[in-house]
Curated annotation (Swiss-Prot):
Record-listed Phosphoserine modification sites: S17, S28, S71
Naturally occurring in which organism (per UniProt): Mus musculus
InterPro entries tied to this protein: CENP-R (IPR009601)
Sequence segments annotated as region (Disordered): 34-78
Compositionally skewed regions (Polar residues) per UniProt: 34-48
Positions of the UniProt region annotated as DD1: 20-50
Main location: nucleus
Protein name listed in UniProt: Centromere protein R
Organism lineage string: Eukaryota, Metazoa, Chordata, Craniata, Vertebrata
Coiled coil region boundaries: 82-112
Domain notes: The DD1 domain (also called RepD1 domain) mediates the corepressor function and is essential in the triggering of apoptosis. Contains one Leu-Xaa-Xaa-Ile-Leu (LXXIL) motif, which is essential for the association with nuclear receptors.
Function: Transcription coregulator that can have both coactivator and corepressor functions. Involved in the coactivation of nuclear receptors for retinoid X (RXRs) and thyroid hormone (TRs) in a ligand-dependent fashion. In contrast, it does not coactivate nuclear receptors for retinoic acid, vitamin D, progesterone receptor, nor glucocorticoid. Acts as a coactivator for estrogen receptor alpha. Acts as a transcriptional corepressor via its interaction with the NFKB1 NF-kappa-B subunit, possibly by interfering with the transactivation domain of NFKB1.
GO terms of biological process kind: apoptotic process; cell division; CENP-A containing chromatin assembly; chromosome segregation; negative regulation of epithelial cell apoptotic process; positive regulation of epithelial cell proliferation; regulation of DNA-templated transcription
Length: 176
């Protein structure tokens, strides 16, 4: 017995007209790595455009430019940084003195002195002159570091008597 079959294409077309299309986009060739033979997992893992790449490398390029400066300019900047740091330390000492005076004058703080709640509230313990002593210690360490660096610079310089222009004199100095 023959069976009649009819294709009902119109009905299926109407049902699927509002569903999302199944068109698959081709993968970009820029996302393919010939070295590893793989595709990029995330489109956001590395910049695709050259402008984004420049923006990404911006700070490192600036760092490289700064490192290429001549040594006198670098020395001036480090001296300025050290001087600025010392100025800040002296300001901290002055402000710590003022802070300690204010804390002594406040009667409510004096009543709570030694209480753990006050230390938790302020964030530091009320050890007398703790800020001042810490700033003084930091200042002393900075001066020691500066003196050490200056000593190392003087020590590392080649004096004219140590510098031999002739290879014969150099070998003679080594043997003696």
């Amino acid at each position: 017995m023959p069976v009649k079959r009819s294709l009902k294409l119109d009905d299926q077309f109407e049902k699927n007209s509002f569903s999302p299309s199944k068109i698959v986009r081709k993968k970009s060739i820029t996302a393919y790595s010939p070295t590893t033979g793989t595709y990029q997992l995330s489109p956001f893992s590395s910049p695709a455009t050259p402008k984004e790449q420049e923006h990404r490398n911006g700070p490192s390029n600036e760092t490289r430019k700064r490192s290429n400066l001549s040594s006198p300019v670098r020395q001036e900047s480090t001296v300025k940084d050290r001087d600025g740091f010392m100025v800040l330390l002296s300001k901290i000492e002055i402000s710590s003195e003022k802070t300690m005076e204010i804390m002594k004058n406040l009667s409510s703080i004096q009543a709570l002195e030694g209480n753990r709640q006050l230390e938790d509230l302020i964030g530091v313990s009320l050890v007398p002159c703790s800020l001042k002593s810490e700033a003084r210690k930091t200042k002393e360490l900075m001066t020691k570091v500066i003196k050490q660096k200056l000593f190392e610079k003087k020590k590392s310089r080649i004096t004219p008597k140590d510098h031999h222009l002739d290879s014969f004199e150099f070998l003679k100095a080594i043997l003696n």
